Amino acid sequence: MSSRGRAIQKALANYPDFNQTLSALNEMEEQTEKSFSTFTTLSASNGSSPEYFLGSMLKESDESESVDDDESVNDDLSPENAVEPYKGSEGEDSFGDKDETVFFEEDLPWSAMVQKTVNGKLVAELSAPQGLTPKQLSQWTDSVLALMDLSKNIRLSSAKIDYLASGLKITEHMSSCFSSTAPPLLKEFQPVTLSHRDTSPERGPSSRPSRPTVMPPARTLILENTPSTPTPESTSSASGSPLNLPEIKPPKDWASIAIREFSLNPLSGDGPQYKGTLARLFGSLESALQYANGGNPSTKDMLIAGLRRKGIFNKIRIKYFLDPIYD
């Protein structure tokens, strides 16, 4: 019995079934020694290293594989396998970004005015000319405001526009019957020159327009009031008046005119006529009579007001003459 067995026997002398347990341990130890000696003999005869020597073998294989990888990389970087750069390509530092052409989306085409109807009301959006300086934009705004003030006394809808080198010339042809809202100056037929600095000239039976303020050459706006050719009836009636005033006609029967059908001739001459009634344009007979009783408008004024109320004025004026014809 080995020294270890004797030491265990001494320490466990009082252990129950000690002798039986000790004999079992001795048998297991003898079997382990026999199997180990057999494995060592077979390994020596086959010439292979035991498993505890595989660590050094794996280390050597890793080193050989890394050497092979380095050689393959060097082969890929050889001049024969090098990839030729794209012709005309440059490095990042020499990239000519200033020479690149940049395309921007085109702006929408400019339009002088856009009309639309919002909640039954006509809304016009005016577009200022492009490329104006702040001073020029202010002058353009003043010109529009002056024109709006002038429209209170002059019917611009029936005026004639002439293009001049210095601006626009607007000429209104007066009818033989003056409206109750027309200023006294209109009957004297005195030319009036307005600018954006002179928006409200004095008007009276004996007044004369003051010296006009000259606008810049490209912004001058000339407006003249010229009478239409008087008819013999108006001439005879005016001559009988001590003040040379035209004859005042009795008010029209708008109740019957508003329900009568009128027609508008097309500008092209070969298209169909536009037909309708003033009551239909205003939405009802009561609305048409309410507008007519607010002043002394002409039939053409009633037509234009009705077209604007319906929201089709811009569409009709480019296709038809705005002179209503009643059968």
From Swiss-Prot:
InterPro entries: Phosphoprotein_C_viral (IPR043036). Residues 28-96, 192-246 are annotated as: Disordered. The modification Phosphoserine is found at S284. Residues 87-96 have a biased composition (Basic and acidic residues). The record marks W140 as: Involved in oligomerization. Residues 62-78 have a biased composition (Acidic residues). The modification Phosphotyrosine is found at Y15. This is Phosphoprotein. GO terms for cellular component: host cell cytoplasm; virion component. It comes from Piry virus (PIRYV). Homodimer. Interacts with the L polymerase; the association of P and L forms the polymerase complex and positions P optimally for encapsidation of newly synthesized genomes with the nucleoprotein. Interacts (via N-terminus) with N(0). Interacts (via C-terminus) with N in ribonucleocapsid (via C-terminus); this interaction allows to package the L polymerase in the virion and positions the polymerase on the template, since P acts as a bridge between N and L. The keyword Phosphoprotein applies. Residues 34-49 have a biased composition (Polar residues). Residues 302-322 are annotated as: Interaction with the Nucleoprotein-RNA and template-binding. The N-terminus is disordered and is involved in binding N(0). The region of interaction with the L polymerase is necessary for transcription. The hinge region is highly variable. The central domain is involved in oligomerization. The C-terminus is basic and essential for binding the N-RNA template. The gene is P. Signal peptide: none annotated. Belongs to the vesiculovirus protein P family. Nonenzymatic cofactor regulating the function and conformation of the RNA polymerase and part of the transcription and replication complex. Binds the viral ribonucleocapsid and positions the L polymerase on the template. Acts as a chaperone for newly synthesized free N protein, so-called N(0). Plays a role in virion assembly. Residues 202-212, 226-242 have a biased composition (Low complexity). Keywords: Chaperone, Host cytoplasm, Phosphoprotein, Viral RNA replication, Virion. It is found in: Virion; Host cytoplasm.
